[in-house]
Amino acid sequence: MLNQTFLPASLYRGDAMHQWDIHTYANHYWHPVAPISHLQPGEVLAITMLDQPLLLTWPTGEHPRAFRNRCPHRGVAFRQGGGTGQSCRRLVCPYHGWTYNLRGELLAAAREADFEQDFDRQGWGLQELACRIDGPLIWIAFSDQALTLEEQLQLVHTEAGAAWNTASTLLRQSRSSLACNWKIAHDNTLDDYHVAIAHPTTLHREQGPVRDYRHRFSQHNNLLETPHPDGGRFLTFGLPPWSHLLVWPDGRLAWLEFMPERPDRCTMQLHLFAGSDAMDAATADAWLRDMLTFLDEDKALVESVQQGYQEDFQPGPPHQLERRILHWQGLYRERLGSAGNSIEERSHEAISALRS
């Protein structure tokens, strides 16, 4: 793995690469779109994922479902975005009154006897996306060619399955914008070379001495395992497409992801989960403060890297503690190759877009 080089800096900028990331690379994977606590049976939730308006529904007695948030008649959204689910029996288009159940089936269209052509309700259901629950999150896939969720979360299921399936209570969350390409933030969170240096009083105290670092890899996941000062294992997973999971020995989970926003900006989303009644509000607040402290330390670093990754920059040689970066970058190279484009071709597109 160490005979690889880092991705060229040109892949971290330019609209051509940004569009490929959100419209092609992203379609190879499942995406967590809401904590399960944000949607209950009999509710709907409007969200936006990668600039695409979506509608989550949970028909009573069934599993959650996901649809494009647009009426098949003229494309108007059924609902505007909201933080949590809202009770709903039927979805009614505000434009022409087409009415759907939570399964996405058309129940009625206003004055449907007056359409010029024969009108069949069954032909006008909502456009559905694959949707399922795994761990404390609701997931969707934009394409039927996406990796299976079992493959995407393989190491999580095998190494932290108990915590993953029991820490279902969302305690705290945070969302902020970073002035860097998402790949820079993702690389940084996979970078075990910098923790002892950049986070001596924060994350380093959780992960412990570098000599105790143990790495594991599956085809699509990587894992840093360290002994926690309080006993047990502290696990840090790197997951496609741009996600990270931290697991404490007591079963707490921190889910972190870097969502592409623009070529030079991404959105950092953090969710903290634990079992029911695992901690009081003050303890949860303190946990969030601790997480945001080390993430603020990283913010300064990744935004500086974005400035450094100008078109004449070539990244230096990888260190053995940067193997997790190389692992995911290898997967990214494969996706570029499967699209029929070499690294050099994509780099040229990115540079051309930057100069145009």
Give residue ranges: language-model regions:
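Short Pro/Gly-enriched beta-strand edge/turn motifs at strand-loop
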Residues: 27-36, 109-115, 237-242
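Rieske [2Fe-2S] iron-sulfur-binding domain
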Residues: 38-144, 150-151, 155
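N-terminal short leaders/motifs
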Residues: 1-14, 82-95, 127-133, 198-223
